A protein has these predicted regions:
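Conserved protein-kinase catalytic-loop segment immediately C-terminal to the catalytic Asp
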Residues: 357-361
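Short loop/turn segments that connect beta-strands within the blades of beta-propeller domains
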Residues: 114, 362-363
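A structural signal for well-ordered alpha-helical scaffolds and beta->alpha junctions
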Residues: 80, 84, 156-160, 230, ...
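Juxta-kinase regulatory segment immediately upstream of eukaryotic protein kinase catalytic domains
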Residues: 2-108
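Intrinsically disordered, low-complexity intracellular terminal segments
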Residues: 195-224, 243-247, 252-255, 283-356, ...
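Hydrophobic, Leu/Ile/Phe/Ala-enriched alpha-helical segments that form helix-helix packing faces
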Residues: 83-95, 162-170, 269-280, 416-420, ...
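ATP-binding pocket architecture of kinase catalytic cores
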Residues: 103-350
C-alpha cells in the first residue's frame, strides 16, 4: 500500500487573491446575467427547471445543503470576535490597539468548497494588511455529522495527520503551514514553533526518543488551553498568496498546448506522487492524529470523499472509523457492499482529481500543494495518471478523446520514469510498470469507479464491458443476470421507481420555492 491523494478535495477552497473591501464580492449562486428563464447554478452549470430533474446527482440535497451553508456562514460570522481571539491565542499576536488589530473579513469574501468554509483573517497595522490567515471549518451538513456524530472530528484528525506525515517524510513537497487546529469538544493544539524555547527543545528530544524506540510518530503540536472555544472543529492555515503561485486552473486553458509548460508540470506531479509513495504502508487506511498523546498512527478507515458523500446522503455506514485493511480483497468487498447500500437508500438512484489544488508559477513549475484532505494509504493498483490532463473528465474519455489522453498518459509516465531515477524508493515496487499494466488490463477504469460517486454509469459500458464482450446483446444479458443480485429484485426496482417519482415531485416544489425567493 502507498500513500495517495484519493479523490478531489475542495476546488478553490483557499484564497489565491484577496479583494479589496471595495471590490465586488463573488457572484451569487442563483442569478446570472447570461441566463434566461427560471433556473439556478449547480456546480458551475446553469440548470433549468426541466433539466434539474435529469441530473444524476441529488439536486434536492444540493438545494438543502446550500441553504444550510448560508446559515452556517452566518453562525460563523456571529462568532467572528471569538475566531479572531482564537487566532490571536494560537499565534501569540498582540491585542488590538489604535495601530494594530485583527480583522475577520466579511462573509461575501469567504470561500466555500465542497466540504469546508474558509474564513479569511487579516492582521492590520496602520490600516494596512501585514499578515493573512485561513481559518477553515468543515461543513457539518456535508460530512454526515447529524447521522454519525464525530465525523467532522474524524476528518480533522485525518487531515492533520496528513500534514504531520508530509512534514516529516516529504519535506520536498511545499504545503501550507498548519499553525493550529481544534476539535468539537474544545481541545485545541498549536504548532511548537509558537511555544517558548525550552518547550521546543523538550519536544525535539521527545520526538527523537520516539524515533529511536520505534514508537508512533510524535507530532509538533502541543495542547493549547488558553484559546477560547469556538464550538466547531477547525484548522488554522497559512494564507498562500499569488507571490507563491496561482491555481493551475487559472492558466490551464491559456497554456494547455504549451509542450514545455506541460513537461514541467508532469515532472512536478510525478515528483509529488513518487514522494508520497516512497515509503510502503502497512495497511489500507488513513493516518489519524491522536489527541491524547499527539502522535499519528495508521489506524483510521480509508476516508474517501465518496464515502462521506454517500453517508451524508443517508447510506448506512459500512466501514467503521477505526477499521483498516491488510489486503485489497477485503477493502474492495466492503466498498462494493457500500455501493449496493447506496443504491438502496438513494431516492434518486434510478437514473475526482482536480487541477485547482495545485499551485504553479508562470512556467508551470509546481510551487505548492493545497487541500490535503482525503489522503489515504490505498492499494498501489489505484495509483493512476490524472484524468484531467487533457481537459476531460473520466466519462468523457472515449473515441478521439481517449486516444488523446492515452498519448498524454504515455508522456506523463515517461516523465515519471525519469523522476524515478532521482527518488530513493524504500520498496521494490515498479510503480510505472503497475500503472501501465493497469491501463492495458483496463483495471484503471474499475478503480476509478471505486473512488467515484457515479462513474459506474458511464465507465462500465464504455471501457469495462468491451473487455469481455463486444456483442450488441450484452446489455440485455446483464439485465437478466441482475435478477440474481439479491432476493426480491423486482420489488426493489418498483420501490426505487416510486421513490424517483416522489423525488421529482419534491424537487419541483423546492425549485419553485427557489425561484420565488430570487
Amino acid at each position: 500500500m502507498d500513500l495517495q491523494i484519493s479523490s478531489k478535495g475542495d476546488e478553490g477552497s483557499d484564497f489565491r487573491h484577496i479583494p479589496s473591501l471595495s471590490a465586488d464580492p463573488a457572484p451569487k449562486t442563483l442569478s446570472s446575467p447570461t441566463t434566461t428563464g427560471p433556473g439556478f447554478f449547480h456546480h458551475g452549470r446553469w440548470l433549468s427547471m426541466a433539466s434539474a430533474g435529469e441530473e444524476e446527482s441529488n439536486i434536492i440535497l444540493a438545494i438543502r445543503f446550500r441553504r444550510t451553508a448560508e446559515k452556517f456562514r452566518q453562525w460563523l460570522w456571529d462568532r467572528r470576535d471569538n475566531i479572531a481571539a482564537v487566532v490571536r491565542s494560537h499565534l501569540h499576536l498582540p491585542k488590538d490597539d489604535g495601530n494594530y488589530f485583527l480583522e475577520v473579513i466579511p462573509t461575501e469574501y469567504w470561500r466555500q468548497g465542497g466540504f469546508n468554509m474558509c474564513v479569511l483573517v487579516v492582521a492590520m497595522v496602520g490600516g494596512r494588511a501585514t499578515s493573512r490567515f485561513v481559518f477553515r471549518c468543515p461543513l457539518p451538513h456535508k460530512l454526515a455529522e447529524s447521522q454519525y456524530p464525530g465525523t467532522m472530528d474524524e476528518k480533522i484528525r485525518c487531515e492533520v495527520a496528513s500534514y504531520v506525515w508530509i512534514q516529516e517524510h516529504c519535506p520536498d513537497i511545499r504545503i501550507p503551514a498548519l499553525y493550529a487546529f481544534g476539535f468539537s469538544d474544545g481541545t485545541q493544539f498549536t504548532h511548537t514553533s509558537q511555544a517558548p524555547f525550552s518547550l521546543r527543545v523538550a519536544r525535539r528530544v521527545r520526538r527523537w526518543v520516539h524515533r529511536i524506540l520505534g514508537r508512533p510518530l510524535l507530532s509538533n503540536y502541543n495542547r493549547n488551553t488558553s484559546a477560547p472555544a469556538i464550538g466547531t472543529p477547525y484548522v488554522l492555515l497559512e494564507f498562500i498568496g499569488p507571490e507563491v503561485g496561482n491555481m493551475l486552473s487559472m492558466t490551464w486553458e491559456q497554456h494547455i498546448n504549451d509542450a514545455e509548460r506541460r513537461a514541467r508540470l508532469y515532472e512536478g506531479i510525478s515528483r509529488i506522487m513518487l514522494s508520497l509513495t516512497r515509503l510502503p504502508q502497512t495497511r489500507i487506511g488513513c493516518y489519524r492524529f491522536n489527541p491524547n498523546d499527539t502522535t499519528i498512527t495508521l489506524a483510521n478507515r480509508p476516508l474517501l470523499s465518496t464515502t462521506i458523500i454517500f453517508e451524508n446522503a443517508n447510506t448506512p455506514r459500512t466501514i467503521q472509523p477505526s477499521e483498516t485493511y491488510h489486503n485489497t480483497d477485503s477493502f474492495l468487498s466492503d466498498m462494493l457492499s457500500f455501493f449496493d447500500d447506496q443504491f438502496l437508500h438513494d431516492p434518486h438512484a434510478v437514473r475526482s482529481e482536480n487541477d485547482a489544488n495545485i499551485l504553479v508559477d508562470d512556467d508551470w513549475n509546481i510551487t505548492c500543494l493545497i487541500d490535503l484532505e482525503w489522503i489515504c494509504a490505498l492499494p498501489i493498483e489505484m495509483l493512476e495518471v490524472p484524468s484531467w490532463l487533457t481537459n476531460r473528465s473520466p466519462e468523457q474519455l472515449t473515441g478521439e478523446h481517449l486516444d488523446l489522453f492515452d498519448n498524454e498518459r504515455q508522456v506523463f509516465l515517461s516523465a515519471m520514469d525519469k523522476e524515478l531515477k532521482n527518488v530513493q524508493q524504500e520498496h521494490d515496487i515498479q510503480i510505472t510498470s503497475i500503472m501501465r499494466d493497469s491501463w492495458t488490463s483496463k483495471r484503471v477504469w474499475f478503480w476509478t469507479c471505486i473512488q467515484s460517486v457515479n462513474l459506474w454509469l458511464f465507465l462500465i459500458e464504455d471501457h469495462i464491458l468491451p473487455k469481455f464482450s463486444y456483442h450488441d446483446g450484452i446489455d440485455d444479458d446483464l439485465k437478466r443476470v441482475s435478477t440474481v443480485w439479491r432476493e426480491g429484485v423486482r420489488q426493489i426496482v418498483e420501490a426505487k421507481q416510486r421513490e424517483e417519482t416522489e423525488y421529482q415531485k419534491e424537487l419541483q416544489h423546492l425549485l419553485k420555492e427557489e425561484m420565488a425567493a430570487k
